Swiss-Prot record:
GO molecular-function terms, A-Z: acylphosphatase activity
Name of the protein described by the UniProt record: Acylphosphatase-like protein MJ0553
Lineage: Archaea, Methanobacteriati, Methanobacteriota, Methanomada group, Methanococci
SUPFAM superfamilies: Acylphosphatase/BLUF domain-like
Segments forming domain Acylphosphatase-like: 4-102
One Pfam match: Acylphosphatase
Transmembrane region(s): none
InterPro entries associated with the record: Acylphosphatase, Acylphosphatase-like_dom, Acylphosphatase-like_dom_sf, Acylphosphatase_CS
Length: 153
């Protein structure tokens, strides 16, 4: 018997390309449903399952996303069986409430990550300059040692 479930995914799952990944996994497993960002910061999936093993594989595949993508952080997946069956078109489809608003949020998130990358690059630049200074000092000392050895020979 086909049952409709709601899966609620908590964590850093919005504006990081998560729903696209869900669509891909769902289609690969032959699951029908929808995925959308909820205003509380979660991602929600409404999907039909007629096989418990497929549902568990779907959830495990979702959880595994955070290992492949450092932007995604899944805290927990909550599962609710719905009392009503909802018929969905084949595959998992993404629902967007406002594509422009969504795009702006993703751009804002992207800017945060770019700033983080630049700040880390500055730190790495300082470290590399320190290493360079140390190497220059080491070369000077080695040259002095070389000169002393040449004088003794």
């Amino acid at each position: 018997m086909i049952t409709t479930y709601e899966l609620i995914i908590y964590g850093r799952v919005q504006h990081v390309g998560f729903r696209d990944r869900i669509e891909h996994i769902g289609r690969g497993l032959g699951i029908s449903g929808v995925v959308y960002n909820h205003k509380d910061g979660t991602v929600r999936i409404l999907a039909n399952f007629d096989d418990e093993e497929i549902k568990e594989l779907f959830k495990k595949s979702i959880k595994a996303l955070e290992k492949k993508d450092k932007l995604i952080k899944i805290e927990k997946i909550e599962e609710k069986e719905l009392n009503a069956y909802i018929e969905f078109p084949e595959g998992i489809s993404r629902l967007s409430s406002d594509d422009i608003l969504e795009l702006n949020k993703k751009l804002d998130e992207g800017v945060k990550y770019i700033k983080l990358i630049f700040s880390e690059l500055e730190e790495h630049k300082k470290i590399l300059l320190d290493i360079k200074d140390t190497q220059i000092k080491t070369i000077k000392v080695l040259n002095e040692i070389k000169e002393l050895l040449e004088k003794k020979l």
